[in-house]
Amino acid sequence: MSFQEHEKQHIEKNVKRKLTDTELQILAAEWSEHCSYKSSKKHLRMLPTTGPNVIVEKGYDSGVLDVGDGFVVTVHIESHNHPSAVEPFGGAATGVGGVIRDILSAGTRPIALFDGLRFGNIENDAHARWLFKNAVSGIADYGNCLGIPTIGGEVEFDDCYKNYALVDVAAVGFGKKSKLIKNHANVDDLVLLIGGSTGRDGVGGSQFASDALEGEDRSAVQIPDPFIEKLIIEAILECRDANCINAMKDLGGGGLSCAISETAESLGIGIELDVKNVHLRESDLSPDEIMISESQERMLIISDPNNLSKIKEICNKFRIQCSVIGTVKEDKMMHVKNGDETIALLPADFVARGPLVDREKSKPEYLSKLPSSPSSKSEMSFSDILLKLLSSPNIASKHWVFRQYDHEVGIRTVIKPGFDSSVLRLDNGKSLSVKIDGNPKHCYIDPRQGAIGCFEEACRNVVCTGATPMGMVAHPQ
């Protein structure tokens, strides 16, 4: 755990006292690159976020699009690279679980998954083959257990990914516009933790995901449990239908630290919680570990006290745990207690809005060394060139990958994996065309034109199914 000099100055200027150990852990988690986007946020703000079909609400972790007839589609993409490079099965599986809960937090049912995968050269690298095989298995296992089809994606292999993996997972949700969670909170509302128990898995995961990968820190990789996730989905949607949820957020990077601070900041409220009320997997967890644990399959809910009995009834029905861990306050503070002892007391916006970093930038030297024109004519015959291309793992059929995914479950899949774009049947009689595309080599040679090319390719693939592009999510990395 370390802070940059400008972050130390920011703390001294705003807090004016020595921070407790718990406060330091909370800030280290929330201000990590993984959670705060401190280096990229200023650039991401350049992206257009409004449109005729876009619904913008407070606190959503997924994009929401109005598809007419009173229905909405939610979409989100994120990566789980570091964990997948260390423990590919668990890392990829928990990546699926996290993106699904982001869809769920808006109040929509997850209906489809996509993945974008990058690995080293599997033709001559046994480690790359191990990463590839197990990451695909992790995605397949989690999605198949949930009954959510993985209906598309892409896989690419290159020497530049040696000893590493890029694992992007995207999810699509669907629901009624009237059932969207209108995130809000009232003073004295209850703060509930629903789902899996809190353990040591994933402690320090946000800092781990923000640093250069130098070793195999398996303790920072979360443990997946898709069966608990399935129960959470059904329980949350039943609570939604019973109008028991005022606000909701997934516990992802940074665990409770980030979920509490970001929820309080976005809603303009204070939250007081007691770590002794958190249901635990290991009884000897310290308060700091409880706050920054990234154990999976957990959701934070804010609800009116009058709805508590109904929520507990639903959770008991699905056999998932539900704990009242705190209450909503008016003071806009993040107040963490360990019984009667206050272990952290900070303004929620101070925690959630960490200082941004304006990093130096310069044109990479390698760009000036690239040839200005194509290389001389190859001595290979056209037949040999064609055979070499067709034998490349990047062009060869990816049937081995998508045959492991149940892309039929849910009976929505109209156009299946292997085509230009996948198409889903929606309940309002319309169809949704979705595609994930990337071109790392083009972006490496010309970042601007490469990004434009990725966007254009995705649009063209969607258009090939007869659909009109209406929204995009991106995950630059």
Residue ranges and their predicted role:
Residues M1-Q477:
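Glycine/proline-enriched, intrinsically flexible loops and inter-domain linkers
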